[in-house]
């Protein structure tokens, strides 16, 4: 294949290409940006720089930087998105569902087996998980017109699994309760 390519290009052009490739491969360090950069000059030739510990313009830069933690939400009577802040710890009920670090209700939908199996998961449950499961199962069965809903409880990790897609129903119920 190489000999047929040489015949097609012609002998003069082939020689020029081989010389060019030899030059490139023989001197890779000369073509780097380090070698081609200018040498360091005396400090007098560089412009003066004033180092300021707290410049007044820094507040504009701080607004652009992301916050290290999620800020506490501003108290309002009603939020336009429908979000509600978490109320008290729910000690009178015997259980508590803690919000996530982004102040969201921890109800998730897991899809398995190419979307055929849908499982709703309630996480971050503290306290009497069995009572919460009974209350949530009653809400889900009421939304399903009395059909039985299979549940699974993981007491150690504080999770309740519901068979089916019940994210909206459970999230609305937990928001009503103040979690």
Swiss-Prot record:
- GO MF annotations for this entry? structural constituent of ribosome; translation initiation factor activity
Q: Which Pfam families match?
A: Img2
One GO cellular component, as annotated: mitochondrial large ribosomal subunit
Report the locations given in the UniProt record: Mitochondrion
GO biological processes? mitochondrial translation
Keyword list (alphabetical) reads: Mitochondrion, Ribonucleoprotein, Ribosomal protein
Main location (coarse class): mitochondrion
| Keyword Mitochondrion found | yes
Q: In which family does this protein belong, per the annotation?
A: Belongs to the mitochondrion-specific ribosomal protein mL49 family.
Could you give the subunit structure recorded for this chain?
Component of the mitochondrial ribosome large subunit (39S) which comprises a 16S rRNA and about 50 distinct proteins.
Protein name stated in the entry: Large ribosomal subunit protein mL49
Lineage, highest ranks first = Eukaryota, Metazoa, Ecdysozoa, Arthropoda, Hexapoda
Source gene?
Answer: mRpL49
